[in-house]
Amino acid sequence: MKKFMYQLAILIAPFAFAMCSENGNIPVESNWELEYIYSNGSEMAPPEEHNATIAFLNDSQIAGDTGCNRFFGNFTATDNSLEFNNVGSTRMMCPQMQFENAFMSTIENTASYNISKDQLVLKDSLGNIIALLKKIEPVAQEN
């Protein structure tokens, strides 16, 4: 029995360490859809049929969609701190650019987060809630 437990521990250990390494508690390979942005004391919901999403990928990478343009970059998460960096995007012009600019500003201003059930809360450096996202199933990318 001891030998079995030892072998089991050896098999599980790499996965356990990989899950809690540099990505804090952000679940990699998770996808989130924006519900609200909070800016200057007001709440802004995505325009109808304007699904803004973000995916946390392996190797501390992100990919997302503003509802118009796609974006990509890196993230660093430790405990409850979260920082997005090297973020770039496509540059198409769309009718809802005000919303897209607000969403990208939210990404840039994120300093911390918490996850409760299937909701991701992004906060700025002062601890103010700046966005709420809900967990979703992965979206198939079009070629």
Summary of predicted features, one role per range:
Residues 6, 19-143:
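Lipid interaction determinants
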Residues 8-16:
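Bacterial N-terminal signal peptides
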